[in-house]
Structures are given as C-alpha cells and as structure tokens.
Amino acid sequence: DGMNAAIANTMNKDYAAAKRAIAKDMSAEADYLRAVIASEEGDMRTAEAQLKSAVKKDEKMAKKAMKDIHFKKLFEEGLKF
C-alpha cells in the first residue's frame, strides 16, 4: 500500500521515496503526509499548500494539524484555514 510505504519512508527520512509512494494518491491523508514531508525538508510554503489542500478535502485534518509539531511554525506565523 502506497500510504504505508510513504509513512515508513518518511520515518526513515527517505523523503524522495515517500513522495513517490503517494504520488498518485490525491486523498486528504496523502496531502497531509506531503505537508509533513515538506515540513521535514524545510519547505514551509509547500507544507502550507498541502495542509490547506488536506483540510479542504477533510475538515478533521485541521484539528490534527493544530496538534502536530511539524506545523507549529506555520501556526505561529498566522496560518488559518
């Protein structure tokens, strides 16, 4: 399953492989994971865009994101959904 492979690759810091594993997955969960990966890579602009896309698809992602350390900086900088 692409999502499980992507999560495992993200945990192992193999971000390129993680992105490939979910490249065709357009779900809210995949967008959220792409936001996490972008955050890990220091690309906060992409992290914000992917996070907003995830929340647009599934409002519950907003609550999850507010508790996620990966996005603390975005919220401190005024991110709103």
Language-model segments: which ranges?
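TPR/TPR-like (Sel1-like) alpha-helical repeat modules
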Residues: 26-28, 39-63
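Terminal, low-structured helical/coil segments at or just beyond the last alpha-helical repeat
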Residues: 56-81
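Alpha-helical repeat scaffolds
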Residues: 14-25, 46-54, 78-81
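Alpha-helical adaptor scaffolds
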Residues: 1-43
